């Protein structure tokens, strides 16, 4: 049921399917790729994850906004979603860290939201037909009129959205995870010489930077357009390739830079978009998934070991395109797509999921330790 005085809103998919509901965010019209996220928690982290740039996110969990929002859970400086779709929402959150309700937060950041939608039916449609463009409006309440706006929007395939979310200036990240968090600073790394990591920012999440800092890394974040020569001027011990939105094959500057960085043979770790860019740089290909992987309980593994992982991506590395010197370390166990790879001889590895969680499980936090060990090992070999 709508909250008293709620304004009518309309969601329409690119195939013309209408979903009438009520507004719980800003007024206006928005168009983006309609996707779904199956997580029961973490809506604030999802909305502020730059990887969701250009997307209207359907939350499958039937209640949204119960814990409000707060400054600590922001994964970037502002939300990047184009819109939010919910079954039911609350305007009166209950959580000791909450400083604002979700509807007020969306209004502040000019994000359009619609609730009262049968999100189960919508999700089943997206699973069956595939993710597609759509639009939400509080102004245009006739499906055919809104459809004209949707049809004018570009497809996610071939779209370079990294340029919209990458940093424009180089900066150093110093904040590590707090002591009261389950995964705080890593004790065995305290007191050791710091490692310099240059993070190529395709749309990096803050908790990735926190985890690197927690493992004793000095993290320098650079724009996605930074050249290999400029990166190597920092004399990094390792190079990190971040997550990000859009089609990885369209991030041409990042691919060229990564190819050139491979020649330096420095330890390299990629997450999500970074995994795809590393794969492309090693000669692989990528393809668009039918509806993507977005949620907190995606099983990944190889042989006997399984990790429950947080994922958010709509593209994947094509298994048959990998070069002989590259091996698969993980598969997504739901659909057997490539979820991790590494070079057989050189210190390059990547995963298609988010070991930093935020939100999600911490099964794969060990990958940050693996990266640190590779850097310390190479540094010791050079010094010795």
Swiss-Prot record:
Species, as recorded: Synechocystis sp. (strain ATCC 27184 / PCC 6803 / Kazusa)
The residue ranges of the Glutamine amidotransferase type-1 domain are 196-381
HAMAP family (alphabetical): CPSase_S_chain
Q: Which family does it belong to?
A: Belongs to the CarA family.
Query: Which terms in the Gene Ontology molecular function aspect does this entry carry?
Result: ATP binding; carbamoyl-phosphate synthase (glutamine-hydrolyzing) activity; glutaminase activity
Cite the entry's keywords alphabetically.
Amino-acid biosynthesis, Arginine biosynthesis, ATP-binding, Glutamine amidotransferase, Ligase, Nucleotide-binding, Pyrimidine biosynthesis
Q: List the disulfide bonds.
A: none
Q: Which SMART domains match?
A: CPSase_sm_chain (SM01097)
Q: Which reaction does it catalyse?
A: hydrogencarbonate + L-glutamine + 2 ATP + H2O = carbamoyl phosphate + L-glutamate + 2 ADP + phosphate + 2 H(+)
Pathway given in the UniProt record: Amino-acid biosynthesis; L-arginine biosynthesis; carbamoyl phosphate from bicarbonate: step 1/1; Pyrimidine metabolism; UMP biosynthesis via de novo pathway; (S)-dihydroorotate from bicarbonate: step 1/3
Task: Describe its assembly.
Answer: Composed of two chains; the small (or glutamine) chain promotes the hydrolysis of glutamine to ammonia, which is used by the large (or ammonia) chain to synthesize carbamoyl phosphate. Tetramer of heterodimers (alpha,beta)4.
| One Gene Ontology CC term in the entry | carbamoyl-phosphate synthase complex
Query: Which parts of the sequence bind L-glutamine?
Result: 51, 244, 246, 273, 276, 312, 314-315
Per its UniProt entry, what is the enzyme's top EC class, as one word? ligase
Q: Which Pfam family is an annotated match for this chain, by its short name?
A: CPSase_sm_chain
- Protein EC: 6.3.5.5
Q: What is this protein called?
A: Carbamoyl phosphate synthase small chain
GO annotation (BP), single? L-arginine biosynthetic process
Q: Where along the chain is the active site annotated?
A: 272, 354, 356
Q: Which gene encodes it?
A: carA
Protein purpose = Small subunit of the glutamine-dependent carbamoyl phosphate synthetase (CPSase). CPSase catalyzes the formation of carbamoyl phosphate from the ammonia moiety of glutamine, carbonate, and phosphate donated by ATP, constituting the first step of 2 biosynthetic pathways, one leading to arginine and/or urea and the other to pyrimidine nucleotides. The small subunit (glutamine amidotransferase) binds and cleaves glutamine to supply the large subunit with the substrate ammonia.
Q: Where is this region: CPSase?
A: 1-192
């Amino acid at each position: 049921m709508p909250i008293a005085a709620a304004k009518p809103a309309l969601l329409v998919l690119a195939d013309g399917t209408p979903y009438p509901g009520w507004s719980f965010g800003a007024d206006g019209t928005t168009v983006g790729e309609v996707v779904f996220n199956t997580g029961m928690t973490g809506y604030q982290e999802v909305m502020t994850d730059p990887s969701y740039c250009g997307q209207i996110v359907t939350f499958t969990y039937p209640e949204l906004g119960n814990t409000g929002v707060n400054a600590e859970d922001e994964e970037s400086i502002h939300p990047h979603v184009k819109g939010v779709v919910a079954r039911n929402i609350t305007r009166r959150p209950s959580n000791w860290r909450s400083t604002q309700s979700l509807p007020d937060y969306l209004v502040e950041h000019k994000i359009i939201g619609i609730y009262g939608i049968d999100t189960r039916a919508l999700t089943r449609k997206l699973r069956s037909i595939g993710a597609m463009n759509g639009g939400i409006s509080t102004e245009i309440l006739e499906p055919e009129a809104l459809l004209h706006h949707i049809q004018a929007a570009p497809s996610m395939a071939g779209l370079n959205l990294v340029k919209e979310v990458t940093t424009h200036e180089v900066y150093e990240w110093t904040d590590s995870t707090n002591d009261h968090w389950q995964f705080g600073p890593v004790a065995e790394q305290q007191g050791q010489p710091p490692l310099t990591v240059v993070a190529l920012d395709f749309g990096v999440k803050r908790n990735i930077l926190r985890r690197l800092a927690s493992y004793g890394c000095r993290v320098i974040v650079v724009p996605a357009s930074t050249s290999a020569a400029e990166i190597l001027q920092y004399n990094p011990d390792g190079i990190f390739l971040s997550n990000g939105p859009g089609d990885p094959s369209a991030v041409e500057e990042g691919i060229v830079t990564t190819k050139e960085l491979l020649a330096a043979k420095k330890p390299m770790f990629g997450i999500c978009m970074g995994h795809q860019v590393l794969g492309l740089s090693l000669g692989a290909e990528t393809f668009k998934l039918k509806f993507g992987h977005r949620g907190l309980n995606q099983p990944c593994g190889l042989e006997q070991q399984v990790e429950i992982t947080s994922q958010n991506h709509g593209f994947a590395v094509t298994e048959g395109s990998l070069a002989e010197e590259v091996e698969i370390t993980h598969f997504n166990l739901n659909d057997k797509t490539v979820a991790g790879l590494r070079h057989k001889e050189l210190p390059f590895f990547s995963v298609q999921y988010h070991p930093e969680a935020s939100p999600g499980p911490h099964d794969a936090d060990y990958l940050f330790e693996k990266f640190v060990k590779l850097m310390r090992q190479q540094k010791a070999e050079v010094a010795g």
